[in-house]
C-alpha cells in the first residue's frame, strides 16, 4: 500500500548480532506485514487518517531492541488476552492459520530474545529484545 508511510529509526553505527539471517528475516517481515494489514483493516472503517509504521532499532551494548509502532486497529479487540496471540492456531484474521506469531515467538526465543505486545489507544507497539 503506497499510502502507508514507513519510517526507519536507527543509529548510524553498525549493529552486530549472531543469528540466523533467514529466520530473523521471517520474523521482521511477518511483523511488518501484520502492521500493514492492521492499518488496511482500519482504513476500511476510517477513511481519513495518516497511515504510519515506525521501525526503531537500538543497540544497548548488552542487548538489541526492535520496536515496531503502527496506527492500525491495534490489540483492543483482544481484551486482556494479548498473550493468546502467541498460541498456535489463534487468529483474528478471516483467512489466517494462527501460525505466524507462534512461529515468530519461537524464532525470537531461539535467538535468546523476547517479544512484547503493547496496546495503545491508536494502534499497537511490538517490542523485541535480543540479548547479545
What is the predicted function of each stretch?
Residues 75-88:
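Short conserved segment of the HATPase_c
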Residues 108-109:
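Detector for a conserved hydrophobic position within an alpha-helical segment of the HATPase_c
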Residues 36-61:
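ATP-lid-like helix-loop hinge signature
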Residues 24-25:
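A residue-level detector for a conserved hydrophobic packing site
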Residues 100, 104:
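Short alpha-helical Gxxx[C/S/T] motif in the catalytic ATP-binding
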Residues 3-15:
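Conserved catalytic submotifs in the C-terminal HATPase_c
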Residues 16-19, 92:
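Conserved micro-motifs of the catalytic ATP-binding
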